[in-house]
């Protein structure tokens, strides 16, 4: 049996749960319970704060978990965890920022003895040490942007996705510390256990199949027999399109293929010009 640690709330919780659901790993949640069953009796779920998950997985409390790369770095666990997957969402950057009217415009302007407010004291300290800087770190649990304007700090080190929040709070970015996204990580000892690693890889395979399918579409159509070669040349598909007989019409063939979502518009237009008809474009839940 394996225990999967998932964020109990926050912006990455919903999309992760949706991917697991689409992969077939349905989770039975009852109220505010911290533990849940899945359709697979060998896979249990634990809900926890995303910031605690790196340590839970590292220490073997959970076998596999979902968390942010920034949180792994904050807990200094990235070297002790097996990185399995980058979900490519929940993207953010941890940056140093200063008030717009500050004389600090780059990392070179930061001086020893300055104060910096952050929710990431460990990561901030290690970063500054690498830069040869010794600042007083003020740990906050939220609303970091206000710190320079109430005399708490000279700078902040905070997460930003687009930079809009910084601008709205009259702050300017002076240095990018690290880029982060949502990750699937595993306990290294669990990955060495044949039974546990098999289950973990099963979860990983399911997630990958959903993520891969998100950028694909199944396109189906009927086409004149004398146009099949031309039509199949514009929809190569995965290993080639599928062509089959239509029993009620000897002059037409049915063609199915999987194509990239960003090529649907152009492909459909080309198919219509070549005589394809009854064209259907369908989302795909999983591709294995």
From Swiss-Prot:
Pathway per the UniProt entry: Amino-acid biosynthesis; L-histidine biosynthesis; L-histidine from 5-phospho-alpha-D-ribose 1-diphosphate: step 1/9
Protein name in the entry: ATP phosphoribosyltransferase
Assigned keywords, A-Z: Amino-acid biosynthesis, ATP-binding, Cytoplasm, Glycosyltransferase, Histidine biosynthesis, Magnesium, Metal-binding, Nucleotide-binding, Transferase
Pfam families associated with the record: HisG, HisG_C
Gene Ontology biological process: L-histidine biosynthetic process
Keyword Amino-acid biosynthesis: yes
NCBIfam families, per database record: hisG (TIGR00070), HisG_C-term (TIGR03455)
Similarity annotation: Belongs to the ATP phosphoribosyltransferase family. Long subfamily.
Job of this protein: Catalyzes the condensation of ATP and 5-phosphoribose 1-diphosphate to form N'-(5'-phosphoribosyl)-ATP (PR-ATP). Has a crucial role in the pathway because the rate of histidine biosynthesis seems to be controlled primarily by regulation of HisG enzymatic activity.
GO molecular function terms noted in the UniProt entry: ATP binding; ATP phosphoribosyltransferase activity; magnesium ion binding
Catalytic activity: 1-(5-phospho-beta-D-ribosyl)-ATP + diphosphate = 5-phospho-alpha-D-ribose 1-diphosphate + ATP
Gene Ontology CC annotations of this record: cytoplasm
Database matches in Gene3D superfamilies: 3.30.70.120, Periplasmic binding protein-like II
Organism: Methanococcus maripaludis (strain DSM 14266 / JCM 13030 / NBRC 101832 / S2 / LL)
SUPFAM superfamilies from the UniProt entry: GlnB-like, Periplasmic binding protein-like II
Coiled-coil regions, chain positions: none
Chief location of this protein within or outside the cell: cytoplasm
Cofactors demanded by this protein: Mg(2+)
EC class name: transferase
């Amino acid at each position: 049996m394996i225990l999967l640690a998932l964020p109990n709330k926050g912006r990455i919780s919903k999309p992760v749960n949706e991917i697991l659901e689409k992969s077939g790993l349905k989770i039975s949640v009852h109220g505010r319970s911290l533990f849940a069953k899945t359709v697979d009796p060998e896979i249990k779920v634990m809900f926890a704060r995303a910031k605690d998950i790196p340590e839970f997985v590292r220490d073997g409390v959970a076998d596999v978990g979902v968390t942010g790369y920034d949180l792994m770095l904050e807990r200094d666990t990235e070297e002790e965890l097996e990185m399995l997957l980058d979900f490519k969402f929940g993207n953010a950057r941890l940056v140093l920022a200063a008030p717009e009217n500050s004389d600090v415009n780059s990392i070179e302007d930061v001086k020893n003895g300055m104060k910096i407010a952050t929710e990431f004291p460990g990561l901030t300290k290690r970063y500054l040490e690498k830069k040869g800087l010794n600042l007083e770190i003020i740990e906050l649990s939220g609303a970091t942007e206000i710190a320079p304007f109430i005399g708490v700090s000279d700078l902040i080190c905070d997460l930003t996705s687009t930079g809009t929040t910084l601008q709205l709070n009259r702050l300017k970015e002076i240095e990018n510390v690290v880029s982060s996204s949502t990750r699937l990580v595993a306990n290294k000892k669990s990955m060495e256990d044949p039974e546990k690693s098999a289950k973990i890889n099963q979860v990983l395979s399911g997630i990958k199949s959903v993520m891969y399918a998100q950028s694909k579409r199944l396109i189906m159509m009927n086409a004149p027999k004398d146009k099949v070669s031309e039509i199949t040349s514009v929809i190569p598909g995965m290993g080639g399109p599928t062509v089959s007989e239509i029993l009620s019409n000897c002059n037409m063939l049915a063609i199915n293929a999987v194509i990239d979502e960003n090529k649907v518009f152009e492909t459909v237009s080309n198919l219509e010009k070549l005589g394809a008809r009854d064209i259907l474009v369908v989302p795909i839940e999983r591709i294995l």
